[in-house]
Amino acid sequence: MKQHTYRIDGGFSFEAGGSVSTLQVGYHTSPYEYKKGMKVIWICHALTADSNAEDWWSALVGPGKLFDTDKYFIVCGNMLGSCYGSSGPSSIDPETGKPYYFSFPKVTVRDIVRALDAVREHIGIEHIDLLVGASIGGFQALEWSVMKPELFTRSVYIATTSRISPWVTAFEESQRMALEADQTFRACESLDGGRKGLECARTIALISYRCEDGYIRKQQEADADTLFADRAASYQRYQGKKLADRFDAYSYYY
């Protein structure tokens, strides 16, 4: 897929308050120019993914695959608040020359969808044949379907819902607490701030994504007589570090 950047000049106001003078949206498309009448598939990614769906969804996206980039014009836009090409807390504030950190306006799903829809209009797409979203991408797909139902022929929502439950809210707050417990997080001295908190937050999220049986099947100790079980623990540490190596705590917090 081909990478692009779209700038929204003239100001962008956020649903929960606040605005920025210029908004940037990163996105990927099939590697050719869109022409009217092409079949369009739009993919909304999960929280820590980027807009290159061919990379992280390689089993489904690409030439000759289910979401065939040769047959369909496929678009995936990077969500606002991310650190993968769209404006967010890690972006540079033009007034200070430093990252926004917590001065970046709070982002809602509707804000993300408005930015994606601006990209759609910029490309010149008038109709989307299939809209697909997973996790927070599913929230975006659902919101977009409600805001502009006439745009879509079919929509697919994966691992999502119309509103999060108290159970999910509790998991998310525990992750925020982990970030805030890292003293480097609020210091806002560099985008490496909150790294250890991010590692911990990711391990909390992993437990919500998986189940007890899964850990028993895949993270069982090789030696049942071991004094100190470590396989599942080392897996958690590995996954926490893996995310912190490619993502920043501020974008995760947002």
Model-predicted regions and their roles:
Residues L151, Y157-K242:
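Alpha/beta-hydrolase-fold enzymes
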Residues F67-K71, C83, T108-R110, D117, ...:
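A gly/proline- and charged-residue-enriched helix-loop-helix capping module
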Residues H28-P94:
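N-terminal cap/lid subdomain of alpha/beta-hydrolase-fold enzymes
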Residues A244-Y254:
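Hydrophobic, aromatic-rich cap/lid helix
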Residues G97-S103, R110-L130:
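Conserved acidic catalytic loop of the alpha/beta-hydrolase fold
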Residues M1-V40:
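Catalytic-loop region of hydrolases
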Residues E126-T169:
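Conserved hydrolase catalytic core segment
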Residues G97-F104, F185-L191:
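Short glycine/proline- and acidic residue-enriched helix-loop micro-motifs
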